[in-house]
Every structure is written in structure tokens, then in C-alpha cells.
Regions:
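Sec-dependent signal peptide recognition
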Residues: 2-8
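N-terminal signal peptide c-region/cleavage motif recognized by signal peptidases
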Residues: 14-16
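Subset of outer-membrane beta-barrel
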Residues: 20-302
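Initiator methionine at the very start of the polypeptide chain
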Residues: 1-2, 19
Length: 302
């Protein structure tokens, strides 16, 4: 029975490794702050973004991720600030944290080059008791790991009116140590993540715009992964799109610009190699520019 318990716990820990890595959102291209801190202030007006994602519905302990963020450009200055609260839970692991963002933008001819950094703190909690093992009295399965850990990231974003190119590493720290019962143990840390992003906007006519985008992701010890996306906007109000993530998933996206200030989006994701592993994602954004007398680009495609 003990071997069965250990097998179950080991399997769940292996699955929970997904939470140790940077969360991947299907709608990342509409708020790249999670991927690139240089994106702070890119929209020129103050804006708040809310995002929640649920995976593998119906499975106890399935991944759940969410965040709320705010960023804005400082008036008459070339720098921007922002902040974010987030959580990322899966099986026995719980992560939550706070982040601050700072970016500096250098105007160029017909484009802008922005450099940004993020900094914050993350609470990591792994409760092995959540596994509900058959042999509940096993001390090895009653351990709780809890620690507060520093986070930092860096990014660059070069953008024009209809295009952007970005390079970033939202997590510069790789692994951590923690004290449990007076003993130093290795905690499951986050491997270094490196992103290259890019996109372009094609105006088909006055009512239709196409926006292809690409994201390359490199993680230490894992194959290079790319995310290819195509979105179409109709009348600056309705956006429909689809994404393909190599060897991982396909994503369908629907966006609605209710007015110049408020946008809502939904993404449905289906894993390619695993059945019954769908994910649902909801995004909402509100921009304060209209209230402050500033012009809002409706819609802003990135």
C-alpha cells in the first residue's frame, strides 16, 4: 500500500511541474505584461486587466491561474509603471505573488524602443497532505513546504504603429532552497524562460484588419516551442482568432470591444495529445483614457 501511495504522490508531483513554469495564456498577445515587462505603458493610457484561466475542468486539483494588473505611462515622461497580483495553483502546489513593473521608452523615427524590468515576491506552498494518500500516516506524505521567494525579469520592446518585436525573460531566477524541519531541501524552482515575440497588422479594407503574431519560447531543458496566432478584426468591434502551440494545443479566441474603454475576450484551448483536457480563459480590460480626456485607440491590436 505504501508503494501505491508513493506512486500516486510522485505522479501528481510530476504533473504539478506544469505550475512551476511560466503560465501560458491563450490571449497573451492582448496584454503582454505577463511575458514582457517592457510592455508597461505601451497603451499610453492607464488600464486595468483581469484574466482567469481554468484547465481540465472536472478534475480535482486541476490548474487554475489568474491575475489582475494595472499599468500607465507617466504624464509628459518617457517612463511607465505598473503592478500585478497573480495566483497559479495545480494539485499540491500553490503560487501567488506581487510584481512591480518599470519601463523606459525612447522615441525613434516612426517607432519606439522600450526597456523594462519587473521585480516582486512570490509565495510558494506545497502541501503533500493534499494528495489524500491511502496511507495517511506516512510522515513523508505530510510535509508542507512554504517560502517567500524573490522574482525579477527583463524585457525589450520595439514597436511601430502596426508592428512590434519583443525579447524578454520574465523570470531570471532559476531555483531556490528552503528550510523544512531544520533541514535544507531543494525546492522545485522555475527554469529560465526566454521569449521572442512579434506581430504585424494588415488592413484588408476599412472594416477588416488581420493581425498575425508569433511567439518563440525557450526553456532550459525543454525543446523550443512556438505559438502561431492569426486574429481578424471586423469593424473595430469583433475579433476572431486561432492559435497553434507546437506539440501542445490549439486555441480559439473571440474578442468584443464593447466601447472605446472596455474589452472582453474568451479563449478555448484543447490539448493535442491528451483527450478531455480543455481549458477556458476569460480576459477583461478597462482603459481610463476617456475619463482623463486622452484619446483611446479603439481597438488597440497589441
Amino acid at each position: 500500500m505504501k508503494k501505491i501511495s508513493i506512486f500516486i504522490v510522485s505522479s501528481m508531483i510530476a504533473l504539478s511541474g506544469f505550475a512551476q513554469q511560466q503560465p501560458m495564456y491563450g490571449q497573451y498577445m492582448f496584454n503582454m505584461l505577463n511575458v514582457n515587462p517592457a510592455y508597461a505603458g505601451n497603451r499610453d493610457v492607464g488600464n486595468v486587466n483581469f484574466l482567469v484561466r481554468r484547465q481540465w475542468l472536472g478534475i480535482d486539483g486541476s490548474p487554475a491561474t489568474g491575475s489582475i494588473s494595472y499599468d500607465q505611462r507617466i504624464k509628459d515622461k518617457n517612463f511607465s509603471i505598473g503592478g500585478q497580483m497573480y495566483y497559479d495553483n495545480v494539485f499540491i502546489q500553490r503560487r501567488s505573488g506581487l510584481q512591480g513593473f518599470y519601463s523606459y521608452s525612447a522615441p525613434m523615427k516612426n517607432s519606439t524602443l522600450s526597456l523594462g524590468m519587473s521585480f516582486g515576491v512570490m509565495n510558494y506552498n506545497a502541501n503533500y497532505g493534499r494528495t489524500n494518500p491511502f496511507q495517511a500516516g506516512d510522515p513523508a506524505l505530510q510535509r508542507v513546504v512554504n517560502a517567500f521567494l524573490p522574482t525579477a525579469g527583463f524585457g525589450a520592446l520595439w514597436s511601430g504603429e502596426k508592428w512590434y518585436v519583443g525579447l524578454s525573460s520574465p523570470n531570471l531566477f532559476k531555483s531556490y532552497k528552503s528550510e523544512v524541519n531544520g533541514k535544507s531541501i531543494s525546492m522545485a524552482g522555475k527554469e529560465g524562460h526566454y521569449y521572442i515575440t512579434g506581430g504585424y497588422i494588415f488592413s484588408v479594407n476599412d472594416q477588416v484588419a488581420l493581425k498575425p503574431s508569433l511567439m518563440l519560447k525557450s526553456v532550459n531543458g525543454a525543446p523550443l516551442q512556438y505559438d502561431v496566432n492569426m486574429n481578424a478584426w471586423f469593424g473595430d468591434r469583433i475579433g476572431i482568432g486561432a492559435s497553434y502551440r507546437t506539440g501542445d494545443a490549439i486555441v480559439g479566441i473571440a474578442e468584443l470591444q464593447l466601447n472605446p474603454q472596455f474589452r472582453i475576450g474568451y479563449a478555448f484551448e484543447q490539448k493535442i495529445k491528451v483527450v478531455n483536457t480543455t481549458s477556458h480563459e476569460l480576459m477583461m480590460r478597462y482603459e481610463f483614457g476617456g475619463l482623463l480626456g486622452k484619446k483611446i485607440l479603439s481597438p488597440r491590436y497589441y
